[in-house]
Amino acid sequence: MHEQYSPREIEAAAQSHWDAQKSFVVSEQPGKDTFYCLSMFPYPSGKLHMGHVRNYTIGDVIARYQRMQGKNVLQPMGWDAFGMPAENAAMKNQVAPAKWTYENIAYMKSQLKSLGLAIDWTREVTTCKPDYYRWEQWLFTRLFEKGVIYRKNGTVNWDPVDQTVLANEQVIDGRGWRSGALIEKREIPMYYFKITAYADELLSSLDELDGWPEQVKTMQRNWIGKSFGADIVFDYDVASIGIDGQLKVYSTRPDTLMGATYVAVAAEHPLAQRAAESNPAIAAFIAECKAGSVAEADMATMEKKGLATGQFVIHPLTGDKLPVFVANYVLWGYGEGAVMAVPAHDERDFEFANKYDLPIKQVYTGEGKDYDASTWQDWYGDKAGLTTINSGKYDGLDFSAAFDAIVGDLEASAHGARKTQFRLRDWGISRQRYWGCPIPIIHCDSCGDVPVPEDQLPVVLPEDVVPDGAGSPLAKMPEFYECTCPKCGAPAKRETDTMDTFVESSWYFARYASPNYEGGMVDPQAANHWLPVDQYIGGIEHAILHLLYARFFHKLMRDEGLVSSNEPFKNLLTQGMVVAETYYRTLENGGKDWFNPADVEVERDAKAKVIGAKLKSDGLPVEIGGTEKMSKSKNNGVDPQDMIDAYGADTCRLFMMFASPPDMSCEWSDAGVEGANRFLRRVWRLAHGHVSAGLPGKLDVASLSDEQKAVRRAIHLAIKQASNDIGQHHKFNTAIAQVMTLMNVLEKAATATEQDRALVQEGLEIVTLLLAPITPHISHELWQRLGHADAVIDAQWPQVDESALVQDSLTLVVQVNGKLRGQIEVPASASREDVEAAARANENVLRFTEGLSIRKVIVVPGKLVNIVAN
């Protein structure tokens, strides 16, 4: 055994052993407990960042721990390989997205391997390969035929220069991020998943997910947004509108209908369009609305604007005429594209009414409540503790009674009905992009939209295309889109839109169970053997979209008979971000020039807080920006490869797991990395000294001295606490702290006798086993050096010897009037009276109680004695 810890050699040897033995290749073993551990797969952006390292190390620690519990563990990996970054890189570098993607995958795979992750690489999936996406095309055709996927017009952000649809994030101040052109709202045909058909189940089955963070479940509940209300129908005022008809709105507060003073419609609503025909101002306002963002978040924060159309509708209960406004805050794709406005009890309507001098009619009041129509107060929107006023026959009712009475009358007059509604909208998956999965539909003039037959799948995406950013490349390739109709044989046109890349990541977890299966999307037998995933790990930023879509897809696959479980992920761990300090200088134009922490020399105070910083290259000061998520934009990232090259993967892994609990942010610290490396060198040094003296004989537990019992107690206390920390709570940082505490004991332990050395042997074996999931390479080497023929990867997690934890005697602190005055050692079985007597008799305690009257003695069993005297 070398005297010096050499991570490069140790890690290469361990990884070589795992590869040769196929240590992580798993197959179904009926009768053996399974554990499916999955970290969210990466986008192949070019190289790993520290967020990846943290995510995959957390997963690996859990997977290795479960393997040591004797389970058959599956931990696969793949690549979420379609998406816009590849197209952007292709345009920048004039290279096909496929080439860029596959080169990135090769490099990132080598990085993942260098981390020593226990991954079954035989199950690797790459979502941009036809053998993967053919199966989502197959599912698409099945769902299209069932009506779960349908086609309709959808409103999108259209860039008239680049001739393409932009995501909301690509619209900056109303202009395209690349072209700078003013963005238009445009309606184009798109394909939709009918996720709303599963809204009730997606909501109710959240209650079954006991292993998910409550925060994530709450976010999903709010996103699905189940609400109880009513459809309310307002008859057209024929004199002002010119035609007969009805305006329908949905409201969660029909109880406030008597306070409605106007209605607002979206720019695309037929009433708005009708008004625009004869009113140029309305036509111009509609054009302005259409140029705005279609993002709900933007709608919430933008200035609310409206214009009176000159039209009126009839209040269904009072017969009053209510003016119709066209407003920029009403979305055509949501509900009926119209809302009833009750300014007195809705904050948005209140602001709008005050802006345009519209009536505000209070219909709720409460004891001690004063209503002021010029200033919004939060109670205006409450339901509880209020009663109706100014509502005619509905006066004096609480929320529930007013709701029932008003909806009852609306139903009786055919002007409304109770309705349960969801905030969730159907999932539009059409993308006018190249680098995505082709939508398997053929458009025929005679037959309409025809799914591509199964024997013609996959529809293969050509991989030699270099996009130029103007429109969809596929729409310019007759060799791709020209085809014949599968039904009638006539010339037809293939769909040139591709699928939202969230589709690929919505079912990959199931494909891992049978990645090479050619008989279907998944092999149901293999899928049901492994699924649901026992532990899923990923960032909180995926709480809604990815996790909701994956749950939806799992239910779609269940209904196709592919899986038998209802939910894809039993337990979810959302890891925190990796953050680091930031430094910058302000430029003349007001921008910021960010410097990497490695290029900055810092001055710290006694608490290690940065109080000064200067650039190493010129010695001049830089501004301290605080700690933020590692990112390219802030130039505060640390390349994992540099860390692995300098310290080894085990140091990297140990630091990541020790720096903070996995669900909290992890602050990068060079000193912390060096500390982790120092600790591993300590373990190596102790093991080297022990092994060099020759391995001892067997430990005789029955003949241990009190000092030896104390050492053995520390060993088994570490097992007990680390088992609880890793196995029950995923508190890897406190488990590592237990191992460090044990190391302190072992370094001081006696080595004079064979029994002493046998005890240190047991201690080192336990240190090795407890560290094995966290620092697997050094553990692999130490296990062999400690005399074991089997590899530590095949070892069992250590068991606690409860008898070792039993103490013959206890050391208790003795206080006098709350101040430490001595220590006593008493038998573990000592009575309260014996403990009190020993405390009173302590020499130092006698000195501090001399001449005082002892009023009472407080004994805290196993901890302390406090003598109160005056």
UniProtKB/Swiss-Prot annotation:
Assigned GO CC terms: cytosol
First-listed, main subcellular location of the protein, grouped into a coarse class: cytoplasm
Motif segment ('HIGH' region): 42-52
Gene3D superfamilies linked to this entry: 2.20.28.290, 3.10.20.590, HUPs, Isoleucyl-tRNA Synthetase, Domain 1, Valyl/Leucyl/Isoleucyl-tRNA synthetase, editing domain
Catalysed reaction, written as an equation: tRNA(Leu) + L-leucine + ATP = L-leucyl-tRNA(Leu) + AMP + diphosphate
Domain of life of the native organism: Bacteria
Sample GO molecular function, one term: leucine-tRNA ligase activity
SUPFAM superfamilies associated with the record: Anticodon-binding domain of a subclass of class I aminoacyl-tRNA synthetases (SSF47323), Nucleotidylyl transferase (SSF52374), ValRS/IleRS/LeuRS editing domain (SSF50677)
Motif 'KMSKS' region, chain ranges: 629-633
GO biological process: leucyl-tRNA aminoacylation
E.C. number(s) listed in UniProt: 6.1.1.4
UniProt keywords, alphabetically: Aminoacyl-tRNA synthetase, ATP-binding, Cytoplasm, Ligase, Nucleotide-binding, Protein biosynthesis
Residue positions binding ATP: K632
InterPro entries: aa-tRNA-synth_I_CS (IPR001412), aa-tRNA-synth_Ia (IPR002300), Leu-tRNA-ligase (IPR002302), Leu_tRNA-synth_edit (IPR025709), M/V/L/I-tRNA-synth_anticd-bd (IPR013155), Methionyl/Leucyl_tRNA_Synth (IPR015413), Rossmann-like_a/b/a_fold (IPR014729), tRNAsynth_Ia_anticodon-bd (IPR009080)
UniProt-annotated location(s): Cytoplasm
Pfam families with a match to the protein in the record: Anticodon_1, tRNA-synt_1, tRNA-synt_1_2, tRNA-synt_1g
PANTHER family linked to this entry: LEUCINE--TRNA LIGASE, MITOCHONDRIAL, LEUCYL-TRNA SYNTHETASE
Protein family (similarity comment): Belongs to the class-I aminoacyl-tRNA synthetase family.
Name of the protein in question: Leucine--tRNA ligase
Species of origin: Ectopseudomonas mendocina (strain ymp)
Taxonomy of the source species: Bacteria, Pseudomonadati, Pseudomonadota, Gammaproteobacteria, Pseudomonadales
Gene: leuS
